[in-house]
């Protein structure tokens, strides 16, 4: 019997979700988002993505260094470079570099070695990206440098997870208008891959869907959860009417109740703000959270379930209990939960 919190990473689910990407965008190459340690899944545990993507995208140089140790696949550096030192590191790592700000152009243009770049333009999100005017100035300037090869022009949707949001079409129109002359283009994230075929172009950039999470408010059952987090029942007891559970006595029993204390808490990455009633899965039965989440422990009502000390409890990552559900109960998003697992939790690879 293990008394540890364990995160299991399903290799078959990774393969399945990548296949969903390919089925939805059969004519596009795949740039898989593996930033933030593969959305919290650990880059050393996502071999199906690494082996079967055309490119792998990270945010920072430090992430590119770790990724380069385990693969020779092309790496796209989303944050690009600002200083010459960063440029040299990116070249050494054989990264393709995103240019998203006019201050980067001088650094890029001073290269002494061949480099491949992607140019990012702002079509309405106003986070990163060159304006249309800056973009045309950039391609004119860099076209005179034989060491610089522009691989692709990209942009990013602000509201792709809201299928009918008017910004989706306005951004797509702006992108097409600005890049009509460009051979290779990229705009589609997970939500656009699943809902907007006109945005697929030459490269799609799946992120959250690779890990089995729907980019939309409605859960997508075609995607399979990759991360499953589980912990053991550490204690079972019966409390009486009027007894309270947990810090602050925020939950009070209205009748005799059997409760299980489970060995996971916010110190492991379980959400501190999970509400009373947040479900966990015990022996294929959903049981409600009662009382506040502690650093190391949570309590649930198991009055209607047969369970024993040592039984495994799934906190999220089953078809019956998706991470999207836990995020809603906790007033957060699945991205934050996935990337918030603490270092004391053990990760294992499963079939």
From Swiss-Prot:
Keywords from the named record: Isomerase, Pyridoxal phosphate
Q: GO cellular-component terms in the record?
A: cytosol
UniProt catalytic activity: L-alanine = D-alanine
Give the GO molecular function terms. alanine racemase activity; pyridoxal phosphate binding
The family annotation for this protein states: Belongs to the alanine racemase family.
The uppermost taxa in this organism's lineage are: Bacteria, Pseudomonadati, Pseudomonadota, Gammaproteobacteria, Candidatus Pseudothioglobaceae
Active-site residue numbers: 35 (proton acceptor), 247 (proton acceptor)
Q: What does this protein do?
A: Catalyzes the interconversion of L-alanine and D-alanine. May also act on other amino acids.
Name this polypeptide is given:
Alanine racemase
| Entry-linked Gene3D superfamilies | Alanine racemase (3.20.20.10), Lyase, Ornithine Decarboxylase, Chain A, domain 1 (2.40.37.10)
